């Protein structure tokens, strides 16, 4: 007997066609259980290199490896039936040359079954984006605040405050769109500029710390769920406060274990009566 047919997932082409139709709903996903919970509600799930900070406790995304991205991409794809799944290319896996970028992007797609890759960069990456797209690899661009470049760009600060910086972001967005990216993430960019870019480009923009006028929005799922209490970026809204819920659950568990209240009779196995 053959396996039941898998529901057809949304594709980069589907996502691109949503511009001027309705907002694109996107979140990051790193594991199978979370992907299953998000799948019905999200158009696009990004296996972001933010996993280095969220799951592994790294200070930046620079330490994330290709192997980490592939492993988590495989996990997410196991939990998805509907959403388009895009995987971040980690720092150092695509900047050296167009050939390096294609080799690693092709590996990601082959080993995970994802729908495309995301890479950071502007005018300097346009030729690479075109090279990938021409060879069958859908690309989600990323301009504005680029986390992989925090060591050379002044850290995690919003972009586009002065005209020179704004002009650079405009040029970056235009170049990546013209190179063939199916959509573009705009991160940490002043609202009027993100709005202007969205209205100018023919491809969808997905904002994070950008503008409500963007064609879609994305957040780091762990931020949105309130799993971190020590720092909350300005652009994050907590739709839940799971850090407190989890902490209380663990506290209650510990209390019951110490008091020998858990496991109770309903949680243990008794011999069958003959």
From Swiss-Prot:
Q: Which family does it belong to?
A: Belongs to the PanB family.
Q: Which cofactor does it need?
A: Mg(2+)
- Could you mention a single GO BP entry for this protein? pantothenate biosynthetic process
Quote the SUPFAM superfamilies the UniProt record gives.
Answer: Phosphoenolpyruvate/pyruvate domain (SSF51621)
The family database entries (Gene3D superfamilies) matched by this protein are listed as: Phosphoenolpyruvate-binding domains
Claim: RNA-binding is one of the keywords in the record:
no
Paired cysteines (S-S): none
Alphabetical list of Pfam families matching this protein: Pantoate_transf
- State its role: Catalyzes the reversible reaction in which hydroxymethyl group from 5,10-methylenetetrahydrofolate is transferred onto alpha-ketoisovalerate to form ketopantoate.
The places in or outside the cell where this protein is found are:
Cytoplasm
Please name the catalytic residues of this protein.
187
Gene behind the chain: panB
InterPro entries hit by this protein: Pantoate_hydroxy_MeTrfase, Pyrv/PenolPyrv_kinase-like_dom, Pyrv_kinase-like_dom_sf
According to its record, what are the GO cellular component terms?
cytoplasm
Give the E.C. number(s): 2.1.2.11
Cofactor comment: Binds 1 Mg(2+) ion per subunit.
Kindly give the CDD domains that the UniProt entry links to this protein: KPHMT-like
An MF annotation (GO) of this entry: magnesium ion binding
Q: Which UniProt keywords apply?
A: Cytoplasm, Magnesium, Metal-binding, Pantothenate biosynthesis, Transferase
Q: What's the catalysed reaction?
A: 3-methyl-2-oxobutanoate + (6R)-5,10-methylene-5,6,7,8-tetrahydrofolate + H2O = 2-dehydropantoate + (6S)-5,6,7,8-tetrahydrofolate
Q: What is this protein called?
A: 3-methyl-2-oxobutanoate hydroxymethyltransferase
Give the top-rank taxon of the lineage listed in the UniProt record for this protein.
Answer: Bacteria
Q: Which residues does the annotation say bind Mg(2+)?
A: 49, 88, 120
């Amino acid at each position: 007997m053959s396996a039941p047919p898998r529901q057809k997932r949304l594709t980069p082409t589907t996502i691109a066609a949503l511009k001027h139709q309705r907002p694109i709903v996107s979140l990051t996903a790193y594991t199978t259980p979370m992907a299953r919970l998000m799948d019905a509600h999200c158009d696009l799930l990004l296996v972001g290199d933010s996993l280095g900070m969220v799951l592994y406790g790294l200070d930046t995304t620079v330490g994330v490896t290709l192997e980490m991205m592939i492993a988590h991409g495989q996990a997410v794809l196991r939990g998805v039936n509907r959403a388009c799944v895009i995987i971040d290319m980690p720092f150092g896996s695509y900047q050296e040359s167009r050939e390096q970028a294609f080799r690693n992007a092709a590996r990601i797609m082959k080993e995970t079954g994802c729908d495309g890759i995301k890479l950071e960069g502007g005018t300097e990456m346009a030729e690479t984006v075109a090279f990938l797209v021409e060879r069958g690899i859908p690309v989600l661009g990323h301009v504005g605040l680029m986390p992989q470049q925090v060591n050379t760009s002044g850290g995690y600060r919003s972009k586009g405050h002065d005209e020179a910086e704004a002009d650079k972001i405009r040029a970056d967005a235009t170049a990546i769109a013209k190179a063939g990216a199916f959509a573009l993430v705009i991160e940490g960019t002043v609202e009027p500029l993100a709005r202007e870019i969205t209205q100018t480009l023919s491809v969808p923009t997905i904002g994070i710390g950008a503008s409500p006028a963007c064609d879609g929005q994305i957040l780091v799922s762990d931020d949105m769920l309130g799993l971190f209490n020590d720092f909350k970026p300005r652009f994050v809204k907590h739709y839940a406060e799971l850090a407190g819920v989890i902490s209380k659950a663990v506290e209650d568990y510990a209390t019951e274990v110490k008091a020998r209240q858990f496991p109770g009779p309903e949680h243990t196995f008794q011999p069958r009566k003959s």
